[in-house]
Amino acid sequence: DFYGENTFRGDLCNADVAMGDLLIHEGAALAAQKHAARVFNADKAYFILNGTSGANKVVMNALLTPGDLVLYERNNHKSVGYGALIQAGAIPIYLETARNPFGLIGGVLDHCFNEEYIRMLIAERDPRRARMDRPLRAAVIQLGNYDGCIYNARQVVEKIGHLCDYIVFDSAWVGYEQFIPMMKDCSPLLLDLKPDDPGIIVTQSIHKQQAGFSQASQILKKDSHIKGQPRYVPHKIFNNAFMVNSSTSPNYQIFASLDMNAKMQEGDAGKMLWHECIVNAIEARKKVLRHCRYLRPIVPPVVHGKKWEEGDTEQMAEDIAYFAFEPGGKWHSFQGYAKGHYFNAPMKLQLMPPGSQMETGE
């Protein structure tokens, strides 16, 4: 009674011809994935029913072979390590990441995006490839992490894109960035990519901050600008990795939730939905600042010469400065950041407890 009869009616066999085979992408399944690709500004979308842990392994298995060099953020999820380093046998070039005095995980330090520094790290593993124009098969970056640190994807691509065949952005904890105008530079899928740019792959946990059931994830592939080049990964190879990491007994309810999520995000309706969410998130922070004595949200104390909570909510929802990790700011105390490189996730309401001195970073 709790679940209802339709839950069981919807648990279909994978041999139902009318639904189409999810593993080879046909029929209604293919139409749903094509629609999601259009909504999310990708060339292809692959719906994943075993979470972004599964999605990451698909991507790593498709891109990497034994001995490939992969630029590897230290904060990458273990599924990336398993797929890239254990299953695929790639060689990691590790990038250092920040952690502040409050224990929060940050992004890659600015000096790690310096080409000379990266080539020096590569030379320690493979001097010959360190001299190549494009020495890295892939870079893997956590576009947004569990503690709310979001990258400026445009800066990442501009700084290291020419060194990589592909850049993979693990966007498990975000995915909404392209629907919020002030966050457009955080979305690698909105970039105008040329033949010399890297291929872009984004993995998203739709079940986290979007509208999917548990384990609903998707892979968004944007690499038509490098099609025909030796580094391009065609659908046949990518789908082999997809099938290896998928079940022949899929759950259609999870799949349907991925389709519905794309429909919810589509067009102006999706942007209005996220605008309402961000307005509510800003108002919630303001109420904490005004009424709570012992708790404080993680926001800059002053923006544009006024206290954060004194800003106009509608204007704040359009201005990324209210969420930017400016270099040297005591309120976040992350060291090694560049200007405009990182932002605090606007949808993640984080509160600092008593004893944390955000004025001094202690």
Where are these regions (language model features)?
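Short N-terminal signal/transit or membrane-insertion segments
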Residues: 21-30, 36, 140-155, 168, ...
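A generic structural signal for short, non-catalytic loop/turn and secondary-structure boundary residues
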Residues: 40-41, 195, 212, 342-344
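Conserved PLP-enzyme active-site core in the AAT-like
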Residues: 50-65, 69-292, 334, 338, ...
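A short, charged/proline- and glycine-enriched loop
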Residues: 43, 66-67, 343-346
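Conserved N-terminal alpha-helix of the aminotransferase class I/II PLP-enzyme fold
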Residues: 5-54
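Conserved PLP-binding catalytic core of the aspartate aminotransferase-like
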Residues: 274-362
